Amino acid sequence: MHTLSNLLSSIKNAQKAQKRVLYFSSFKKISKRKKRFVCSACKMMPRVFVSRLCWDFCRILYNEGYIHGFSQEADGSLRIVLKYHSSGIGVIKKMKTISKPGFRIYSSKNRLSKKREGLGITILSTSKGNLICDREAQKTNFGGGEILCQVF
């Protein structure tokens, strides 16, 4: 499974289960031949591969106000603190993967965020390898890129 898709589904599942904190870390070797997911200490969420993509995605969610924060733990895992309204409903209503490993979607800056009128964000991958949201792309006059996901 694609790393970003795995992170998106883990965040969705954690919000449905009303979890406050998620922990993500790299694969741990169980045997000489196999790599498997190792459950976290609380045994609620599987740990997924932490890459620069995950860090950039969490940075964008934090800057846009969708999560309270994220940090690196002593063991190298990624800790994400989810955000909820006072009624207990998660701030993130919907997360949708747009570009998939088998079907890539690209867009120019002119076609970004016109139909949503500022509701939610679209996350793009740049040619330099980092992630930016559609608002940053409009401000910096970025030409366009691969549309990874949308968050509402």
UniProtKB/Swiss-Prot annotation:
GO terms for molecular function: structural constituent of ribosome. It is found in: Mitochondrion. GO terms for cellular component: mitochondrion; ribonucleoprotein complex; ribosome. Keywords: Mitochondrion, Ribonucleoprotein, Ribosomal protein. Its main location: mitochondrion. InterPro entries: Ribosomal_uS8 (IPR000630), Ribosomal_uS8_sf (IPR035987). This is Small ribosomal subunit protein uS8m. The gene is RPS8.
